[in-house]
């Protein structure tokens, strides 16, 4: 029900680039992720609370995807059943 939908997934020069449409339950509408192996190289949200999504992206850069999943899974926003951080964890889970 809350799973993000993979829009694209490709590998260029060893960097995996994937885009996901987020659940309608959250303010962001898309997450773009770059992975180098199992490490997050960068990520960017489209829409959402700009300061918060920038903060999430900055904190996650350089982290192992599994560690981000462990920290962000299940975070809820306004009793919606998911959140922008949870959507990232769900998207990363699809990539691992």
Please identify what each model-predicted range represents.
Residues 22-30, 34-96:
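Active-site- and interface-proximal helix/loop "cap" or "latch" segments in soluble metabolic
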């Amino acid at each position: 029900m809350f799973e993000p939908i993979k829009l694209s997934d490709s590998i260029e020069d060893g960097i995996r680039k994937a885009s996901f449409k987020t659940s309608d339950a959250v303010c962001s509408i898309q997450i773009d992720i770059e992975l180098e192996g199992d490490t997050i190289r960068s990520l960017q949200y489209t829409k959402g609370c700009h300061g918060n999504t920038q903060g999430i992206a900055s904190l996650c850069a350089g982290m192992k995807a599994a560690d981000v999943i462990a920290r962000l899974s299940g975070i809820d926003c306004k009793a919606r059943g998911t959140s922008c951080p949870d959507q990232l964890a769900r998207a990363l889970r699809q990539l691992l």
